[in-house]
Amino acid sequence: MRLCDKDIERYLDEGIISLTPRPSNEKISGATIDVRLGNSFRVFREHSTPYIDLSGPREEMTAQLNRVMSDEILIADDEAFFLHPGELALATTLESVKLPANIVGWLDGRSSLARLGLMVHVTAHRIDPGWEGKIVLEFFNAGKLPLALRPNMAIGALSFEILSGYAEHPYNARKDAKYKNQQSAVFSRIDKDE
């Protein structure tokens, strides 16, 4: 069952779901709550790596990822990050999200931004039960013009769904949770897959 606006507000008030800083109740509508863009970004560097072998030796994959991904880029609140057509970048939400073991979250982009070519998640829009941390956004500009993205702008909307029970292995309790408590735009940790 998806939570409606009044239940989202109640779950936030009761601390069952936590968003920090908490968006105002005016950001709750129908079945979602708006989230804003944070200050942490990462991009692909100019590189000569011909490809990343996603099933190759871990050490080689780690070295390839380190060669192609930038260090964290911090954008001040009064500055803009420019995403050019055909580019992929990582960023975070301003809000840190904490979910209990019986609720899954879903991140959706905003229609107004999608109509300009901005995808806020390439495929990964599920927020696992037991998640705690900022949400990493996988931006892609499918449009024809560069887009100026500014910290604190409304970037997406979260909805929440109650599971049939409590997950036995919620995300942050798992030893193999690769993005546990993330607070910045962490790049792919596919090299940590078992």
Curated annotation (Swiss-Prot):
Record has Nucleotide-binding as a keyword: yes
Which residues of this UniProt protein bind dCTP? R110, S111, S112, L113, A114, R115, D128, V136, L137, E138, Y171, K178, Q182
GO MF annotation terms: dCTP deaminase activity; nucleotide binding
Sorted keywords for this record are: Hydrolase, Nucleotide metabolism, Nucleotide-binding
Output the InterPro entries linked to this UniProt entry.
Answer: dCTP_deaminase, dUTPase-like_sf, dUTPase_trimeric
Active-site positions on this chain: E138
Pathway info: Pyrimidine metabolism; dUMP biosynthesis; dUMP from dCTP (dUTP route): step 1/2
GO process annotations (BP): dUMP biosynthetic process; dUTP biosynthetic process; nucleobase-containing small molecule interconversion
Catalyses: dCTP + H2O + H(+) = dUTP + NH4(+)
Protein origin, superkingdom? Bacteria
What's a Pfam family in this record?
A: DCD
Q: Does the keyword Zinc-finger apply?
A: no
How is the subunit organization of this protein annotated in UniProt?
Answer: Homotrimer.
**Family designation:** Belongs to the dCTP deaminase family.
Please give the function described in this protein's UniProt entry: Catalyzes the deamination of dCTP to dUTP.
Name the record gives this protein: dCTP deaminase
Q: Which organism is it from?
A: Glaesserella parasuis serovar 5 (strain SH0165)
